[in-house]
């Protein structure tokens, strides 16, 4: 399971002209589910996202988590994080999990975040979405539950 985590001042996701999820100060998480990912991968990434200290404290040091700053999370499914661009000019997506399994694990990831007491907004699975991200910093991190990066 892979995630692009961005610290944001604001974020929203719109589907067919309607805002479906939005957050103020917090994180936008673009989440990709890969073939072979399990419940453990969802739990691992939820723990990382909830507890990563990427917000600045009073001294300007990244020392606070989204929990500490009482922020929220906008989680957006994104199978393209498993795009393989090593051959040719069009990415292949064979590394992405099948849609049914990806949906189940995405929803589990959201539930795991909510267990921490976080407010979590989401996009709409398997829909074309317009995602607005107002970065803060900018701070953008890559996470992989298999620890590939």
From Swiss-Prot:
GO terms for molecular function: D-tyrosyl-tRNA(Tyr) deacylase activity; Gly-tRNA(Ala) deacylase activity; Ser(Gly)-tRNA(Ala) hydrolase activity; tRNA binding. Its EC number is 3.1.1.96. GO terms for biological process: D-amino acid catabolic process. It is found in: Cytoplasm. It comes from the Bacteria. Its main location: cytoplasm. One of its GO terms (cellular component) is cytoplasm. An aminoacyl-tRNA editing enzyme that deacylates mischarged D-aminoacyl-tRNAs. Also deacylates mischarged glycyl-tRNA(Ala), protecting cells against glycine mischarging by AlaRS. Acts via tRNA-based rather than protein-based catalysis; rejects L-amino acids rather than detecting D-amino acids in the active site. By recycling D-aminoacyl-tRNA to D-amino acids and free tRNA molecules, this enzyme counteracts the toxicity associated with the formation of D-aminoacyl-tRNA entities in vivo and helps enforce protein L-homochirality. Homodimer. Belongs to the DTD family. NCBIfam families: D-aminoacyl-tRNA deacylase. A Gly-cisPro motif from one monomer fits into the active site of the other monomer to allow specific chiral rejection of L-amino acids. This is D-aminoacyl-tRNA deacylase. It comes from Pelotomaculum thermopropionicum (strain DSM 13744 / JCM 10971 / SI). The gene is dtd.
């Amino acid at each position: 399971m892979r995630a692009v985590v961005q610290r944001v001042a604001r974020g929203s996701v719109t589907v067919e002209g309607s805002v479906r999820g939005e957050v103020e100060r917090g994180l936008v998480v673009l989440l990709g589910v890969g073939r072979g990912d399990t419940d453990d991968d969802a739990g691992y990434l939820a723990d990382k996202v909830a507890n990563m200290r990427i917000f600045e404290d009073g001294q300007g040091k990244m020392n606070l988590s989204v929990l500490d700053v009482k922020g929220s999370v906008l989680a957006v499914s994104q199978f393209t994080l498993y795009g393989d661009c090593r051959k040719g000019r069009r990415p292949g997506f064979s590394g992405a999990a099948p849609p049914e399994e990806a949906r189940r694990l995405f929803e589990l990831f959201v539930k795991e975040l909510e267990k921490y007491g976080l407010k979590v907004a989401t996009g709409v699975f398997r829909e074309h979405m317009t995602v607005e991200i107002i970065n803060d910093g900018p701070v953008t991190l890559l996470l992989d539950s298999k620890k590939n990066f």
